């Protein structure tokens, strides 16, 4: 456990950021899973779910949770599923 005041503050800040990052990643994964299940079942709202998933991927990328290449690769794969 840190003894220095600034280190104690850093631990609190890091914990808050960790919780926020986990929530953002979970939201992204959920959006992608919803889109994939919708495309497998040939649902009508797959276009809307694609937009939501792409937006979630972009948000995770902009927050530094995933790298730029992974974001592009994931979006490309989702669009290929959509156009199939």
Swiss-Prot record:
- Gene Ontology terms, MF aspect: small ribosomal subunit rRNA binding; structural constituent of ribosome
Family as reported in the entry's similarity comment? Belongs to the bacterial ribosomal protein bS20 family.
Q: What is the species listed in this Swiss-Prot or TrEMBL entry?
A: Lacticaseibacillus paracasei (strain ATCC 334 / BCRC 17002 / CCUG 31169 / CIP 107868 / KCTC 3260 / NRRL B-441) (Lactobacillus paracasei)
Cite the NCBIfam families for this sequence: S20
Annotated Gene Ontology cellular component terms? cytosol; small ribosomal subunit
Function statement? Binds directly to 16S ribosomal RNA.
**Family annotation (HAMAP family):** Ribosomal_bS20
Q: Name one GO biological process term.
A: translation
Which keywords has UniProt assigned to this entry? Ribonucleoprotein, Ribosomal protein, RNA-binding, rRNA-binding
Gene3D superfamilies attached to this UniProt entry: Ribosomal protein S20
Q: What is this protein called?
A: Small ribosomal subunit protein bS20
Pfam families reported for this sequence: Ribosomal_S20p
Name of the coding gene:
rpsT
């Amino acid at each position: 456990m840190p003894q220095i005041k600034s280190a104690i503050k850093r631990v609190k800040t890091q914990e808050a950021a960790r919780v926020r990052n986990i929530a953002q990643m979970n939201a992204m994964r959920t959006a992608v899973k919803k889109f994939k299940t919708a495309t497998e079942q040939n649902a009508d709202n797959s276009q809307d779910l694609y937009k939501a998933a792409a937006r979630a991927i972009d948000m995770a990328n902009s927050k530094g949770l995933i790298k730029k290449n992974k974001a592009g690769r994931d979006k490309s794969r989702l669009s290929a599923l959509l156009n199939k």
